Amino acid sequence: MHEVKQPRRIMVVTGEASGDLHGAHLIEAAGKVDPGLSFFGVGGACMAKAGCEILIPGEDLAVMGLVEVLGHFPTIWRAFRKLKKILHGPQRPDALVLIDFAEFNLLLAAQAKKAGVPVLYYVSPQVWAWRRGRVRRIASVVDRLAAIFPFEPELYQGLDIDVEYVGHPLLDEFAITCERDAFLRRLGLDPARQVIGLFPGSRKNELKYIAETILQSAVKLREKHPDAQFLLPVASSFRRQDIEALVAPYGLPVTVVDEPIYDVINACDAVISVSGTVTLQVALVGTPMAIVYKMAPLSFAIGKRLIRVPHIGLANIVAGRGVVKEFIQEDATPAMISREIDAILTDAEYNRSIRGGLATVQQRMGEGGCAARVARMVSELCREIPGKERMV
C-alpha cells in the first residue's frame, strides 16, 4: 500500500454577481498556483464555468436590506443549514473561502471556526463604510483576510487576524475586447447616435426598487434625445428573457445584451447605474455616469443611521469625493436623473471634469495580480493544516 494525497477541497461562498466573477478568476488562478485544489459551494455561472461544483445558486441568496432579507429568509436559512452540515460533516472542506456577502458569510465563518475549518475572507465586509465594530467579530472567526483596498489593513491592527492587501480583482478582469463602433454595428446599432447604458443591478430586490426608476429615466431622457439608443447588460444572476419582459412595457429602444461588461460600458456615452461594484467597472472605462440607490423605506431608514461614509457609490468612496452624482431614495426621480444624463451628454466641460475624477478612481485601485495573490493565500492556508490522505 502507498499513500495518495487527495485534492484539497475548498468551499467557496458568494451571493453576488460580482463575487461570482471574482470567484471564477480565483479558481482559474488557483489552477496555476496549486493544481491540487478543487472547489465547490455557492456561486453562479462564471464559477461553474471555471470548474466549481455549484451546490446552491448564488442568485437565490442575493438580497439586500433588512426587509428584503426577511422576505427571502426561508431560502437563505435552508442554504445556511446545508452548508453548516457540510462544514461539520465527515467530508468537511480543507478551507472555506468567503467572497463579499457579509451577513451570511460571517455566520458561516463562525460555523467553520467551530468545525476547525480555516477561513479566508476575500472582498471583506465594508467595515470602513458602516458598523466598524464588526472588525472584532471578523477577527474572531476569520484566519486570513484578502483586502482589496489599501486602507483596509490598518482597520485590523492589533487584532488576531492575518490581513494582506492584494489589490482590486476588477483590475485582473478589465479588458475591452471589441472597438466601440464595431461592437455597436454587431448589435445592429448606429455608432453615430448616442448610447446610454442602463445598469439596474444583479440582485432581485434591485430590480424591484431600482429598475423601474432607471427605465422611467430613460423614457424621460428621450424627450430631449429622441435618437438615443440604450444598452442593458444582463447580470449572470438573471435570465435574458426575464429582463426583456421587464423592459418591454416602456416602449424604449433598449438592446438587452449578454456581452462582456467592459465592451458594453465602452460603447456607452453615459451610464445610469446602481451603486455597487459596477460603478468601479464604469470608472475603469472612464464613462460618465449617474448613480441610483433605492430600497425598502424601512431598510433605508435603518441603514442611514449606520452608514459612516458621505457617499454610497463605490466609485465615489474610492475617489474620496463626489466624482459622479448620486440619486438616493426620494431624490432618485426620473426627472432628476435624466437631467443629469442630459448634462453629461451636452456639456463638454462637465463631461471632461467627470472623466478626470474617474481617472482618480483608476489610480487609487492599484495594480493587477489580485487573483494570483489570493490563490496563493488559499494554498498557504491549506498547507497550514495536515493534508487528507487515503490508503490504496
Curated annotation (Swiss-Prot):
SUPFAM superfamilies: UDP-Glycosyltransferase/glycogen phosphorylase. One of its GO terms (cellular component) is membrane. Keywords: Glycosyltransferase, Lipid A biosynthesis, Lipid biosynthesis, Lipid metabolism, Transferase. GO terms for molecular function: lipid-A-disaccharide synthase activity; phospholipid binding. It catalyses: a lipid X + a UDP-2-N,3-O-bis[(3R)-3-hydroxyacyl]-alpha-D-glucosamine = a lipid A disaccharide + UDP + H(+). It holds the Pfam family LpxB. Pathway: Bacterial outer membrane biogenesis; LPS lipid A biosynthesis. One of its GO terms (biological process) is lipid A biosynthetic process. Gene3D superfamilies: Glycogen Phosphorylase B (3.40.50.2000). Its EC number is 2.4.1.182. Condensation of UDP-2,3-diacylglucosamine and 2,3-diacylglucosamine-1-phosphate to form lipid A disaccharide, a precursor of lipid A, a phosphorylated glycolipid that anchors the lipopolysaccharide to the outer membrane of the cell. NCBIfam families: lpxB. Belongs to the LpxB family. This is Lipid-A-disaccharide synthase. The gene is lpxB.
